[in-house]
Amino acid sequence: MPQNTRHTSIVEMLSTPPQLPNSTDLNSLSEQTDKNTEANKSDTESLHKSISKSSSSSSLSTLDNTEYSNNNGNSLSTLNSQNLLSVHRQEWQHTPLSNLVEQNKLIFIRGSISVEEAFNTLVKHQLTSLPVENFPGDMNCLTFDYNDLNAYLLLVLNRIKVSNDKITSDCQNGKSVPVGEIVKLTPKNPFYKLPETENLSTVIGILGSGVHRVAITNVEMTQIKGILSQRRLIKYLWENARSFPNLKPLLDSSLEELNIGVLNAARDKPTFKQSRVISIQGDEHLIMALHKMYVERISSIAVVDPQGNLIGNISVTDVKHVTRTSQYPLLHNTCRHFVSVILNLRGLETGKDSFPIFHVYPTSSLARTFAKLVATKSHRLWIVQPNDNQPTASSEKSSSPSPSTPPVTTLPSLASSYHSNTQSSRMANSPVLKSSDTSNNKINVNINLSGPSPSQPQSPSATMPPPQSPSNCPASPTPAHFEKEYRTGKLIGVVSLTDILSVLARKQTHHKEIDPQMARKQRGHIG
């Protein structure tokens, strides 16, 4: 029997920022830069030169979608972006916002279109948010994102109350609801706008306060040219980190040294510089996780076992997997079950069983945290304390972690729950949730609506109901494999994009007192 081999994941190998070209290329680049500077001194600050893809085999590359893979071969897709492949002569704070504009990803939608159309546009273009215009050229847009879709779903199911009775009635009676009305239901920060001539020194103070995205305009501030999100900025800084020597001391520091995240379970309350750890038990229903994310105004939630060990992650973007009536039983199944379903769906999309690593340790370096945030495309990572029988994470700052093999336990019974006729009717009537042929969202999850037959009880270790056909629903990850990858240690903290950006902001003299929770307070925390 051939021995199974485990390929080291790219996230494990990536402890340092992407390489810059070799010294010969840098010298050549510097000489050319000096010539250009003499020719046009007024452009010195923003001067940069794109690196040719063929200049060196060690050229800077962009990590667009890196996943932990358990099959023979790393799940890695590399996308080189012209805007990111550049070397800057100045410190990162002086980088103009024009360097980060991606006009091809700027897509507006009208406030009059339905939530269904808005959702399909998100999926079609693989975006996480869309500016909603009340009229062409609107400069004061609200944005539609998956938090709004989650609110819509909860409203359809009568899980939340809003002041607009007409919207409530239309949602629950299956009528089309304008997306412009739905985006008003979720508290949002002001629509910040900055001209493309501003630099990162300015925007870091805004994004570091918890604002998720900023509009980049032309110099006259009469036209929006792009949207700069927290995630995009983190990605840019990571992929150009070697061009910014002043980042190195921070990247080499551990989360514990930087005091990022809630690192002591005994603390009653986090400090103003820290995010609260919000989690849900794995045996609680998925609908409770979605409701908790809505109430807490968060975009992802940790899934833990009764002992507080991290076993998974649910993001608000995962709500796209429960937008059809055939997927309704997932809402009343467990969060643990849903995590296994998500992994299975990723396998359908990529052809590989994937296990994204959403955790770090207190001893993890900021560089490693950057790498994992970029690789998982997440807004936060969970900080865990390794189990006693796991290898210590003390080497994370300087070397790749060793794969751990904690004890394997079986999952509890995950029989599908029965659902009420009233809620089932609401799901069926919803314009978004009733569609089973949406061209841009064809995700099939075969669920036994009536639950297991009494004469044929489910296996205690099952993670998904038996598929109707092997061709349309491949087997989900086995319980052993699932537990092996996710039983990472006790959840003790969380580090978010906001936490990291606020640290960068506070390193500047004029942002010393920045509060990473400011924007969240403006949005209005509930509960």
From Swiss-Prot:
**SMART domains of this UniProt entry?**
CBS
* Protein family: Belongs to the SDS23 family.
Q: Which residues carry this modification: Phosphoserine?
A: S9, S42, S46, S430
- Does the record's keyword annotation contain Amino-acid biosynthesis? no
Q: Where is the CBS domain positioned along the sequence?
A: 101-162, 185-243, 272-330, 335-391
Q: What else is known?
A: Present with 21200 molecules/cell in log phase SD medium.
GO process annotations (BP): cellular response to glucose starvation; regulation of mitotic metaphase/anaphase transition; septum digestion after cytokinesis
- Protein's cellular compartments: Cytoplasm; Nucleus
Q: Which organism is it from?
A: Saccharomyces cerevisiae (strain ATCC 204508 / S288c)
Name the domain of life. Eukaryota
**What name does the UniProt record give this protein?**
Protein SDS23
What does the organism's lineage look like at the top?
A: Eukaryota, Fungi, Dikarya, Ascomycota, Saccharomycotina
This entry carries the following GO cellular component terms, namely: cytoplasm; nucleus
Major subcellular location class: cytoplasm
Tagged with keyword Repeat: yes
Q: Where is the composition biased (Low complexity)?
A: 52-61, 391-417, 450-462
